[in-house]
Design a protein with these regions (language model features):
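SAM-dependent transferase fold signal centered on methyltransferase-like domains
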Residues: 1-523
């Protein structure tokens, strides 16, 4: 019997369509061979790790729980250990009577969010034991506390000195008002919910070491969240990390002033995904009255890099009193930008006083160079960070960085060597320093108008006349910048720059924050 032509054509079509089906679909009903999983670039979580001079277990006795540990924070922990050791001998903000007793003084330390207890173990094993009277470590999680107790045995810790608690962090600190000399707080996200209790549990002159990892909020991605958390409005700019530090310090300072206390920043740095602040907190009602001079607002151009920064208040001399606070009226002379004629927007308030203490950084560098601290894994990187910050202190009165690439884009110019750019700034009598954390950012005492003139001068010298306004829309802000007269004559001579590894690469892919620790319920 002959096959029906229509049926024959249909079979051919089905065969053709079947050949087009991907192999994965064909084998759905079969039992496919299990694929080999690609090896991960980051090691699986170990049960035990050694960091500094401490060895800790990350799991409890029955291995049903793994405590939170992030290797990316080892830089943070290394710097904190040597900072606390430096604080033991730092006498700058002490009264003469306290300076005499500093050599014999013993210090108490609290770490309210401990997880593994690693920081506490490192303080016990790496800091001079004769300088420590008490180390308090705490975690809410019962199984985390179980891990901490395992680690106490592992590191042969004297339990008379190191005390373990299982409490809510703020509750523990409120129970111990004015008890601690050093408060080390490293939370997931913002430290702001813990600030009030940290301030109150610290003694007069105590050292606070705080970490903030909520960078999207502090850097301007969610300004409405920044406002209700920190009381400040950010602006999304290339120098957002410095803005983040200044927003956090403003919020901390305004909180401390409720208790007639002021902050003295020692070191503020950012690395990878977080900012870390070290500051001393002191009782001083008179200094609290000077806080308005340390807070300020910024008007930033919506298009170019021009900005105006004004403090909340100014000193006004008075014969009857030492000084009177005269509040600024928060107005600016020109509503529009003097560089490109665009509108300016207001943001802040920020901390506009010092981010660092030069004496502290020099003492920290001195300690770091000693052989007793050579074992620190991040010794050389800490040294580079501190030297970079020390270099920036040449222009410590200049608030916020500039973005070198943005200046080039604003005048439709290809980026040229930063060494040549620095030479041009220096030739006009101004200073410039490169940021310690981003090679594209810099600080200078040259006003934005002068920087744009340098860019335009370079373009005129190195481009043809017809290319000066090429691809520039007459209605754009770039056109307004380029059409302004050049008032300076810079010399483009390259400056020899220091060659060292200031900007190291991450050691592994996905090097950064870990997921938020989840609450583990007992079955």
């Amino acid at each position: 019997m002959e096959e029906n032509p229509e049926s024959k054509n249909l079979n051919k079509k089905l065969k053709r369509d079947n050949n087009k089906i991907p192999k994965t679909e064909k084998s759905k009903n079969k039992n496919p061979k299990p694929k080999k999983q690609k090896e991960k670039t980051i090691e699986k979580v170990k049960e035990e790790i050694t960091e500094g001079k401490a060895t800790i277990s990350l799991v409890n006795h029955d291995k049903t729980f793994s405590a939170f540990y992030n290797p990316a924070q080892e830089l943070n922990r290394d710097l904190t250990v040597i900072s606390i050791a430096t604080y033991f001998t730092f006498s700058k903000y002490l009264k003469p009577k306290d300076q005499k007793n500093l050599s014999s003084k013993k210090f108490s330390i609290i770490e309210p969010l401990s997880a593994t207890g690693l920081r506490g173990m490192r303080y016990y094993t790496e800091l001079p034991k004769e300088k420590i009277s008490l180390i308090t470590i705490n975690d809410m999680d019962k199984k985390a506390v179980e891990c901490i107790k395992i680690n106490i045995e592992k590191n042969k810790v004297n339990e008379e000195i190191l005390k373990v608690h299982q409490e809510e962090a703020t509750s523990l600190m409120y129970k111990n008002l004015k008890l601690y000399d050093i408060i080390d707080l490293d939370p997931y996200g913002s430290a702001i919910p813990f600030i009030d209790s940290c301030i109150q549990c610290g003694k007069n002159g105590s050292l606070l070491c705080l970490t903030f990892t909520d960078m999207p909020v502090l850097c301007g991605n969610y300004p409405e969240t920044t406002l209700y958390k920190y009381g400040s409005i950010p602006y999304k700019v290339p120098f957002c990390h410095e803005m983040a530090k200044r927003i956090a310090l403003y919020s901390i300072s305004s909180n401390a002033s409720k208790y007639k206390k002021v902050i003295k920043p020692l070191l503020s740095y950012n690395a990878e995904f977080y900012i870390r602040l070290f500051f001393i907190i002191k009782e001083s009602p008179d200094d609290c009255k000077k806080n308005p001079f340390k807070y300020g607002y910024m008007w930033h151009c919506r298009q170019c890099q021009n900005r105006i920064i004004k403090p909340m208040a100014e000193y006004k001399e008075n014969k009857k009193a030492n000084s009177v606070v005269k509040f600024s009226n928060l107005t600016i002379d020109n509503v529009k930008c003097s560089c490109c004629n665009s509108f300016m927007c207001m943001c802040g308030p920020f901390w506009i006083s010092d981010l660092h203490d030069e004496d502290w950084i020099k003492e920290l560098l001195g300690n770091l160079s000693k052989s007793e601290w050579s074992y620190l894994k991040y010794n050389s990187r800490i040294e580079n960070i501190l030297k970079g910050i020390l270099n920036e202190l040449v222009l410590k009165d200049m608030i916020f960085n500039y973005d070198y690439s943005q200046f080039s884009r604003d005048v439709n110019l290809s980026v040229f060597k930063m060494g040549i750019f620095e030479g041009a700034i220096n030739s006009l009598g101004y200073k410039m320093v490169q940021s310690y954390y981003d090679p594209n950012l810099f600080k200078t005492d040259a006003p934005p108008e002068v920087i744009y003139d340098i860019m335009k001068s370079y373009k005129k010298e190195n481009y043809k006349e017809e290319e000066y306004l090429k691809n520039v829309n007459k209605d754009s802000y770039k056109y307004n910048i380029l059409m302004k007269d050049i008032k300076v004559k810079p010399k483009f001579v390259e400056v020899n720059r220091e060659k060292n590894i200031k900007y190291p690469m991450n050691p592994f892919p996905n090097w950064g924050p870990k997921g938020k620790p989840k609450e583990k319920k007992d079955k």
